[in-house]
Amino acid sequence: MTEINWKDNLRIAWFGNFLTGASISLVVPFMPIFVENLGVGSDQAAFYAGLAISVSAISAALFSPIWGILADKYGRKPMMIRAGLAMTITMGGLAFVPNIYWLIFLRLLNGVFAGFVPNATALIASQVPKEKSGSALGTLSTGVVAGTLTGPFIGGFIAELFGIRTVFLLVGSFLFLAAVLTICFIKEDFQPVAKEKAIPTKELFTSVKYPYLLVNLFLTSFVIQFSAQSIGPILALYVRDLGQTENLLFVSGLIVSSMGFSSMMSAGVMGKLGDKVGNHRLLVVAQLYSVIIYLLCANAS
């Protein structure tokens, strides 16, 4: 068996996750403005921007089980390369779309071929020593968080200076770099999982001590993510309605980045507070707090 330095893999996977996270979030702040630039009226821009963003997530959810099966058969590294190269085309190609239909089509394909981050996570999880798995996977996850934080800020800045289409070329370059780094530096000595060792999904679910709690957490997370992600397609339009027309793209990107940055800064504090007062109470308070904040945003002037 080939000796693999998992720490080297972790560093490259972290940077790849950072580039991928930045690429995903780069386009969110100005998507409705780009939709308008493609000839869609301002009264329909929010709808088509939301469609362009959500169609990628929907197709990713539908096709991710297929890529998961192939990853179990051929390895995680090939799936990381496949995702990186495919998304280079689907995201970079957005710089050349002539109309809204091509935008929706490429966003759909982007979701179909996505999967860099989950395969990077699975690869590192399979290589890191068990006693270091928590810290290693936690470190790896910060790559996506850091990319998601900085992406909107960078995207808004570049869009103001060079135009929105230039941002898509930058995104394509980021994803291509992630694929190249994976090809050149990620090492994997993959051994397919024997069918008799694979645990059925039903058995995994029934082995959970409180399965109803898992379902409730899934539904709660779904509602929270649904609510939070619904802001992206309308944010730039809302900021413009508030009278901010100068540096609109940069301001929109800054707002998105600030939300992510505040989440990152408070995560550790909230975790400790949850251990002290109870996670259930903290979840209730956090959801009420979110309701108040969004109501205040709705009445901003």
Enumerate the language-model features and the residues they cover.
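Juxtamembrane intracellular "pre-TM" segments in multi-pass secondary transporters
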Residues: 1-7, 188-217
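Pair of pore-lining "gating" transmembrane helices in MFS-fold secondary transporters
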Residues: 6-33, 37, 210-230
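Short amphipathic helix-loop junctions that connect adjacent transmembrane helices
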Residues: 30-46, 234-250
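Central cavity-lining transmembrane alpha-helices of secondary-active solute carriers
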Residues: 51-67, 257-269
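Conserved MFS/SLC helix-loop-helix module at the cytosolic interface between two early adjacent transmembrane helices
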Residues: 62-98, 274-280
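Paired small-residue
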Residues: 90, 101-109, 293
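Cytoplasmic helix-loop-helix junction between adjacent transmembrane helices
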Residues: 106-145
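Symmetry-related core transmembrane helices of the 12-TM Major Facilitator Superfamily/SLC fold
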Residues: 167-183
